[in-house]
Amino acid sequence: MSFGRSLLDHAIRYRRFGSFAALGARRAAAGRTYRAHAMHELLRRRDPAGPGWADVAGFRLRYLEAEWMRYLYREVFAEREYWFATDNPRPVILDCGSNIGMAILFFKSLYPDAEIVAFEPAPWACEAIGETIRANALHGITVHNAALAEMEGSLELFHDPVHPGSAVMSVHRDRMQGEAIQVPAVRLSRYVTNPVDFLKLDVEGSELAVLRDLASSGAIGQIRQMVIEFHHHMSPGVDMLSECLSILEQHGFGYQLTAGQVYTPITRGQFQDVLVHAYRK
């Protein structure tokens, strides 16, 4: 059995198992097998520096840099940061901060008939997503080359021109000290007119702006589950995580938090990625 087929089989098995509480030993065993396959493939790869093509879970993926591709692969497939369960065979998914589309492939491996609306401000990353979609004849995917904000218009996107495949691009200079290009900015609430099964929000520092927009417009009421990558202390010493959690609590969400490694003794105000897994109570 090929790695891609094996990984896809495990992804389907995860979908069938259901919630974390009900999985028990079967899910734990499947999880260990899934991670073992994924990490084996991650370490085995010897891709060119990039750009290039990679085989991922039975799909062909267009990437811009091999190292960043492996980094995204580890987050999305090996660590399953965006795994979710739903009874809807055609879930509506918002992928905010798509980069090269690794999560799009993960969602399609879980739910082949999913309807995915993706947002990515970097035009070169959007081109890579388009190539991946065409190479795999994928359907049900709409890609918007735009940043997400509280107000529509345009924003500066800061990026590293030496590393076009980097996952660290932002409209906030505190997050990326690089060159700037102008990109269109839209409000996510415009695109939330019907129930959304899952929202992935990884927008490099704009997550509060998006949540405020969803809350003020009432669109947050349409969302059933979400994973938010909150960039804690992106501006050193500025504490805003409580606002994120408060918005969720006020709109009927419970949540679990996972955070990146903390080194001791801690450094006050140190940057930290915090994953917020939010679900309807």
Feature names for model-found ranges:
Residues 1-281:
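Phosphate/nucleotide-binding beta-alpha loop and adjacent structural elements of enzyme active sites
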